[in-house]
Design a protein with these regions (language model features):
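Catalytic alpha/beta core domains of metabolic enzymes, predominantly
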Residues: 8, 15-140, 148, 154-157, ...
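Residue-level detector of conserved catalytic or cofactor/ligand-binding positions
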Residues: 184-192
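N-terminal cofactor/phosphate-binding cores enriched in small/glycine residues
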Residues: 2-10
Length: 192
């Protein structure tokens, strides 16, 4: 999974997937990446179903989209907040997620208007009820954010989505799972 287009010149012996950091949100961008030899494009998080359908109609590359996790306040690959507040760059896959912290909103006179609220990331992405629509729009792979999450959280969220995807595929002849294996839905507590 790459953002840096120079890597394609290295003729790596692996299938190239364009990272969400490439901020692909138009048919032209997806078609360009396909012509550059990318097998899969991970789409920008904030696309509508109509935008996804338009991209699907323009190219044949596999399309992947985020279905669960943080809703980024900026375009993926275009955020500099993490790097400016810490030594970790979100554009290099090491986001410290400062947008998920609480902040105070202060007006121009210095008066606090809002105190200690989640002003930049007000909710999380959860498209579990839209899996069928995403499949119908042309999505071939789903992405669940797991960075900075514990193993129990990841296992439970992935198991839940596995059930939702299987249910959606059962009503769509011609579609099937591309992976094998089973995950069980079990809560795992992390020791403190």
């Amino acid at each position: 999974i790459v953002q840096d287009m120079a890597l394609r010149r290295m003729n790596l012996p692996v299938e190239l997937h364009a990272s969400t950091q490439a901020a692909t949100r138009t048919p032209e961008q997806a078609l360009f990446l396909e012509r550059c030899g990318f097998a899969r494009v991970i789409l920008e998080r904030a696309l509508s179903l109509d935008e996804i359908r338009t991209i699907r109609a323009a190219c044949g590359v596999d399309l992947e989209c985020f279905v669960h996790g943080a809703i980024c306040v900026g375009y993926s690959g275009r955020c500099f907040l993490s790097r400016s507040m810490s030594e970790r760059s979100g554009n290099r896959g090491a986001c410290s997620q400062p947008c998920r912290l609480t902040y105070d909103l202060v007006d121009e006179s210095g008066r606090t208007v809002v105190k200690g609220r989640h002003l930049l990331s007000v909710r999380d992405l959860n498209l579990s009820d839209r899996i069928g629509e995403l499949i119908d729009a042309g999505i071939t792979s789903f992405k669940i954010e797991g960075r900075l999450k514990d193993i129990g959280y990841i296992k439970n969220v992935v198991s839940y989505y596995r059930q939702r995807i299987d249910r959606a595929l059962a009503s769509r002849p011609g579609f099937c799972r591309s992976s094998v294996g089973e995950l069980s839905l079990i809560h795992i507590s992390e020791p403190t």
